[in-house]
Amino acid sequence: MSEKTFLVEIGTEELPPKALRSLAESFAANFTAELDNAGLAHGNVEWFAAPRRLALKVANLAESQPDREVEKRGPAIAQAFDAEGKPSKAAEGWARGCGITVDQAERLKTDKGEWLLYRAHVKGESTEALVPNMVATSLAKLPIPKLMRWGASDVHFVRPVHTVTLLLGDKVIPAIILGIQSDRVIRGHRFMGEPEFTIDNADQYPQILLERGKVIADYEARKAKIKADAEEAARKIGGNADLSESLLEEVASLVEWPVVLTAKFEEKFLAVPAEALVYTMKGDQKYFPVYDNAGKLLPNFIFVANIESKDPTQIISGNEKVVRPRLADAEFFFNTDRKKRLEDHLPRLQTVLFQQQLGTLRDKTDRIQALAGWIAGQIGADVNHATRAGLLSKCDLMTNMVFEFTDTQGVMGMHYARHDGEAEDVAVALNEQYQPRFAGDDLPSNPVACALAIADKMDTLAGIFGIGQHPKGDKDPFALRRAALGVLRIIVEKNLNLDLQTLTEEAARLYGDKLTNANVVDDVIDFMLGRFRAWYQDEGYTVDTIQAVLARRPTRPADFDARMKAVSHFRTLEEASALAAANKRVSNILAKATEPLNDIVHASVLKEAAEIELARHLVVLRDKLQPYFADGRYQEALIELAALRAPVDEFFENVMVNAEEKDIRINRLTLLSKLRELFLQVADISLLQ
């Protein structure tokens, strides 16, 4: 069967830059699935994406499906014919569905009986006939939150479509996709290269587009070029470019022919906190800031043009003129804001609603202030500084700078606090109160900042759960999942002595009578333990390990983490699987027991050598392990408990648990309950698979 290269390119107007990669990757995944479902043999499926096109190139695509033999078994002979030998309705219906008569059906005989059988040789359809619908289906399944319509057409897509190229080798596959007749015409760069040209063979893509159209269709190649050229441009001016992955992706999605240029701004603007300048450059203008080797912002920036100019100085000058007013605004806001102390903004917080049932930002500030002080006392931080940080925590939201440049919240609070002469750990806490903002983000760096960050997040969790507005599905308007995980990360990774039970109770108490959910504390803790599950799964722990620890519902995050590590290590021991199975057996036996057990194991009632030996081991281990459990040395405890494998195996091999004599039976059940209690001091290992 011959194979050819297949190409599909959808030429559009400018696609959403932040969605470009996901659109292209989804297109490739969808089309690959269509090929596989259709049984079309193929090689590598390569995707291309630029601001005005999505494309796929499939190597070694078969020109048709393979022929196949089809077998459909019908009713059993006993049900296929009546007593007179006439076909039943079931048989006729089956035959009709196969496109034959009952007389034309074959017979299938096995040792289990005899059935009607339909066999047919089905010729594979051509790729040319199959591909148009497969492309249309793949496009229809793209993750597009909002479709648009253009012209008088009823066609919907993420952006208007102008060209559709479908080539199998050198042949155009005729089709109408998204309202456009397929062709071999491709559009080049808007201002460089050829506006339109024809492609003779699918193998010419993307090289022909590069040479004639001045478009780098390979997304990764375009991104790599921007990164390399920007690094070189920064090196030439003695700096390092801030090439954050998210901005690199966005810029790569905005240009077809990247040209990296360097520009500058007035040094006077460096008196403004760097974060505000960077926010303007990266957020508004999509520029790359440049820092010196000491990490200090330089009065330069790197940007990417979408065209080669004979006079690049004009493009540079134009970008400098665009950014200058924004930097001047930041300078004005900074100077204006410093005329007031942060504390002077407190009254205005009363005018901003946090949540209708939970009050204003001033109300939230008062709660955070009290909770941060309480947390500081629990973890050994400076209570006065934590309380002060709580009082000032939301004041920067009322400043001109943060109102205009919203992403500078927190960091501007730090700068203004320093200007006001606040303690350094208070100032730093104002910046770090929102950390961690995302997975892998830095944690607060000092104890006061930890207290404030936890207080802010716990106040939100207690409040929103307290009025019954739990996250539902993907909807989480108050970012409660992120808040919960942030609290857990801080407590675990900073090894803080905090209990979710008392922490949540204190956070809820500060709301007074505003909360309507009587189960708020349990709901918040359950929610946070659920985030533990997600966190540890991401860390590579198995689900059953997590479930074994969750079964004990430990509410101290640092303690939870210690149990997780202990159980994970326990699983590597030779004795683990046998002891997990034994615990499962013990759990099942105890669940079926209906008689009340003894408080202790009575040695005088023990008869068999195996039960006497097991009881002796349990007494020794119980006394030895109490300090281990008290100190959270769970890994050492489980290593010691692994020694129970032999006596437990002996017990189950030689002892009848449900003896006829009641006192012996109850004593043996009590012995097993004591065994289980020891393991449950760490986790429910009966849940391990």
UniProtKB/Swiss-Prot annotation:
Pfam families (UniProt xref): DALR_1, tRNA_synt_2f
Leader sequence residues: none
GO biological process: arginyl-tRNA aminoacylation; glycyl-tRNA aminoacylation
EC number: 6.1.1.14
UniProt KW keywords: Aminoacyl-tRNA synthetase, ATP-binding, Cytoplasm, Ligase, Nucleotide-binding, Protein biosynthesis
Subcellular location(s) per record: Cytoplasm
One GO location term (cellular component): cytosol
Top-level class of the enzyme under EC nomenclature: ligase
PROSITE patterns membership: AA_TRNA_LIGASE_II_GLYAB (PS50861)
GO molecular function: arginine-tRNA ligase activity; ATP binding; glycine-tRNA ligase activity
Chief site of localization: cytoplasm
Reactions mediated catalytically: tRNA(Gly) + glycine + ATP = glycyl-tRNA(Gly) + AMP + diphosphate
HAMAP family in UniProt: Gly_tRNA_synth_beta
Entry-linked NCBIfam families: glyS
The family this protein is said to belong to: Belongs to the class-II aminoacyl-tRNA synthetase family.
Subunit annotation: Tetramer of two alpha and two beta subunits.
Protein name as annotated: Glycine--tRNA ligase beta subunit
Record organism: Salmonella agona (strain SL483)
Encoding gene, per UniProt annotation: glyS
